């Protein structure tokens, strides 16, 4: 049977402010999400027997705990479909990197299976289901750069500049739960009242706690900071900096390659997943 193959793009938090902590322990955030033209790739094939089978194992992640499998089963359960799927994952994005690998895989799974199973589900419904899997899943479902509030699920589309980025990948996996429970984490940034959202005078409130705990992240920030403003994305560990051209970004990554691992990618306000889905829809309707 023919496979449906779709990307699961990375994201950056261009900045991230923590404005409070809720009674349930979750943190209130303000952040800007932007996508990268770089990510994992998933392939899907229809099954008639209702079985969900992920054929790509990830070290230390049991099959049934994988967000891809959980997303597929949740959609299956809530839609009432009797169909299943075989799923293959080509993993590129690091785990614990702050660039959305697991959340992006889950969102691609929801959108792909809604298409494959011919469900009449709109983005709102898929995003609401995605939120139950993780706070970052809705932005990947919607596929447009966004100013996010709440726990990250209240999304307002924005269109920041789309530069080339150098993304450094320190060889550590940062625990989001550990960072959000850090006693010295800033939790009282003032909510922004200006619109559009200012790009200057911003920061990542998680960065100091991560730098303190993970010297590899601090070293990456120092290395990239010699060439441009360097910032951490999410709760780390990945670090990024913007450049006006691919040539300049490639040059800087080459200079850093002896001590740092990373990649170069274009920023994008419309995710490559949504661009691919739109082209599929156009083909099927023509």
Swiss-Prot record:
Its EC number is 2.7.1.148. It catalyses: 4-CDP-2-C-methyl-D-erythritol + ATP = 4-CDP-2-C-methyl-D-erythritol 2-phosphate + ADP + H(+). It holds the Pfam family GHMP_kinases_N. Coiled coil: none annotated. The keyword ATP-binding applies. Pathway: Isoprenoid biosynthesis; isopentenyl diphosphate biosynthesis via DXP pathway; isopentenyl diphosphate from 1-deoxy-D-xylulose 5-phosphate: step 3/6. InterPro entries: GHMP_kinase_C_dom (IPR013750), GHMP_kinase_C_sf (IPR036554), GHMP_kinase_N_dom (IPR006204), IspE (IPR004424), Ribosomal_Su5_D2-typ_SF (IPR020568), Ribsml_uS5_D2-typ_fold_subgr (IPR014721). ATP binds at residues 94-104. One of its GO terms (molecular function) is 4-(cytidine 5'-diphospho)-2-C-methyl-D-erythritol kinase activity. GO terms for biological process: isopentenyl diphosphate biosynthetic process, methylerythritol 4-phosphate pathway; terpenoid biosynthetic process. The active site is at residues 11, 136. It is an enzyme of class 2 (transferase). It comes from the Bacteria. The keyword ATP-binding applies. Belongs to the GHMP kinase family. IspE subfamily. Catalyzes the phosphorylation of the position 2 hydroxy group of 4-diphosphocytidyl-2C-methyl-D-erythritol. This is 4-diphosphocytidyl-2-C-methyl-D-erythritol kinase. It comes from Pseudomonas entomophila (strain L48). The gene is ispE.
